[in-house]
Amino acid sequence: MERKLALLLILGMVTLASCGLREKHVQKLVALIPNDQLRSILKAVVHKVAKTQFGCPAYEGYCNDHCNDIERKDGECHGFKCKCAKD
């Protein structure tokens, strides 16, 4: 039962993360889970999924939106990650 719940939570959070929600929004949902090993695993999974930025090659303007949201700079897609402009 616990494995099924964990799998559902992971899949749900991956889905939310891939729908344009930022990591900070999904991590707030993870905070609702009781503090144990499952919570640590979910936090790591959400962080890794958010870090890969799969939307980068698929959606035009994704990196611009991402970099504007985080650093208030322009961004471009580099592989599967966004590169934000330097000063």
Swiss-Prot record:
Residues 1-19 form the signal peptide. Coiled coil: none annotated. Transmembrane segments: none annotated. InterPro entries: Long_scorpion_toxin_alpha/beta. It comes from the Eukaryota. It is found in: Secreted. It is not known if the sequenced fragment corresponding to the propeptide is the result of the post-translational maturation process, or if it has a biological activity of its own. The primary structure of this cryptide Pep-3 is identical to that of cryptide Pep-3 from other Tityus species (AC P0DRE8, AC Q5G8A6, AC P0C2F3). This is Potassium channel toxin TsTXK-beta/Cryptide TyPep-16. The lineage of its organism: Eukaryota, Metazoa, Ecdysozoa, Arthropoda, Chelicerata.
